[in-house]
Amino acid sequence: DRICTGITSSNSPHVVKTATQGEVNVTGVIPLTTTPTKSHFANLKGTKTRGKLCPKCLNCTDLDVALGRPKCTGTIPSAKASILHEVKPVTSGCFPIMHDRTKXRQLPNLLRGYEHIRLSTHNVINAEKAPGGPYKIGTSGSCPNVTNGNGFFATMAWAVPKNDNNKTATNSLTVEVPYICTEGEDQITVWGFHSDNETQMVKLYGDSKPQKFTSSANGVTTHYVSQIGGFPNQAEDGGLPQSGRIVVDYMVQKSGKTGTITYQRGILLPQKVWCASGRSKVIKGSLPLIGEADCLHEKYGGLNKSKPYYTGEHAKAIGNCPIWVKTPLKLANGTKYRPPAKLLKER
């Protein structure tokens, strides 16, 4: 007689690594990992996702919106998640800006990090009557407004001495910038200065020497000295060629805190300010946003979570995302495999 044990005689294709026994053959496994493929970015399920700062502002970059370029002012939707689609925001098509002098390119990304963003309905200071005035408010043919007349950014007033009596060199002047947001938000105050060649500086301001500027708010102080001349004529968005340049900066004022700006000639005084609150999770990505996804991943775009873990490229992700692991994970759902038993001969 022959006696055989009741064990399957087929080989097991499943191998799992264990903490105590190394590689072990088992009769069944459940894969816990997936390797995503690149896809388009999407709206994050269960929350509002912001692409462009102002989706209804046509033909406007996010920097246009952040600076208040005429024809580029509109409502910025609230959002818990935001797509950083302009890693290095392009120039604003209104007036030539010296981007390398300041952190102006960071302004759209700063705003993107807030859940709620709105532009104040009135100006933070009366620019015409600011120290060193009276001033007339300068405009540019390169910056047409909604009626196609000359305009300028809504966030700044180009303060040009109004008459020959005050069109002279001046010592440093200081203006206080009050906090005007009404709901305890952070106040983002945009300001800057204009400089040109010596001839234009004398014509506009009565002084051709480099001018000094300082801003201070929330414990942060920034100093500038203007550059005179040396600029090639430059046009933005088909506007008129400009021999001058503007430098743009901003300061963040906390609730109830006053800021200060010390300046000489060529100042771009703050006007409308941004009032921003809450936090929006920001991730680098691309537009347009198509459909919905559980997770937004910088390398793979929109992902729907089919497994708890993933392999592949490790990068920042937001939402209900799988966890990155270096190697695939498996969950054993069968017994430890035993090789087929040998026939036993009767003694």
UniProtKB/Swiss-Prot annotation:
One GO BP annotation of this record: virion attachment to host cell
Glycosylation site list: 25, 59, 145, 166, 304, 333
Membrane topology: Single-pass type I membrane protein
Major subcellular location class: virion
GO CC term (a single one): membrane
Keyword DNA damage among record annotations: no
Modification note: In natural infection, inactive HA is matured into HA1 and HA2 outside the cell by one or more trypsin-like, arginine-specific endoprotease secreted by the bronchial epithelial cells. One identified protease that may be involved in this process is secreted in lungs by club cells.
Molecular function as annotated in GO: host cell surface receptor binding
Transmembrane segments: none
Quaternary context: Homotrimer of disulfide-linked HA1-HA2.
Full protein name: Hemagglutinin
Organism: Influenza B virus (strain B/Finland/148/1990)
